[in-house]
Each structure stands twice: as C-alpha cells, then as structure tokens.
Design a protein with these regions (language model features):
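Conserved short "hinge" loops at termini or chain/domain junctions
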Residues: 1-72, 89-101, 109-117
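Aromatic-residue-lined binding/catalytic grooves and analogous aromatic/hydrophobic interfacial grooves
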Residues: 105
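Elongated alpha-helical scaffolds
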Residues: 72-86
Length: 118
C-alpha cells in the first residue's frame, strides 16, 4: 500500500508547522483538509494531470484511511501543495522554502506525466 490520504493530510499540516502529533488536530480539521485534498486533486485531474488519486464519489464518501492511489514519487508534490492551500485557509503564511518545494515538485510530476500548462 502506498500513501494514505491521512498521511498526505498529516504531512501537509507538517509543512506549515502544524504537525498533528504536536497540535492535536481535531477530526473536523482533518476532514476539512481531506475535502481540500480531494478538491485539489480534482482540479489537477481537470487540468490533465492524472496521477492515480482515488477520488471519492462524493465528499461524504471520502476516507482519511483510504489508500490515496498516488505513486510515491508524487507524494511530495501533493502534500506540499496541499500545505500551501491549508496555510492560506487558516491565515498561516507559508515559508519561501515550502513555496519552492511545492512548485518544483509539481513541475516534476507535470514533466513526468507529459502535461503542459499554459
């Protein structure tokens, strides 16, 4: 099994300094982050970037403990970009390092999957 959706969410919070093991993230916070993950992955897919993410049929069907379906080499792009989204939704300014890592990782998977963006 690869990355679970919970692992992606936890690592995304970690990128913005809110690791669950330190900050005791509530189930509501984790579910909200999962919805953002699902929405981000739906957007990526709509742009032609299909990396195998297991999309739920509806937001209420999404499960944190489900395998994400993504290959290991895509995990950093997913959790770092999710970290950017989570940070902006809670008013936390992401570090410049996170912005660079998220951008570079995203560009790497665009190249790997042969997707060109305008």
């Amino acid at each position: 099994m690869g990355w679970t959706k919970r692992q992606l969410v936890d690592d995304a919070f970690g990128t913005i300094g809110l690791s669950g093991y330190v900050f005791n993230l509530s189930p509501d916070q984790q579910q909200a982050a999962l919805r953002q993950l699902d929405a981000m992955m739906a957007t990526w897919e709509a742009r032609g970037l299909r990396i195998g993410y297991l999309m739920p049929s509806s937001p209420s069907e999404s499960d944190l403990d489900q395998d994400s379906g993504i290959p290991n080499q895509c995990a950093e792009a997913v959790y770092s970009n999710l970290g950017l989204r989570l940070g902006s939704s809670i008013g936390k300014v992401p570090s410049q390092d996170l912005k660079v890592i998220a951008h570079q990782a995203y560009q790497s998977i665009l190249t790997k999957y042969g997707v060109s963006m305008p």
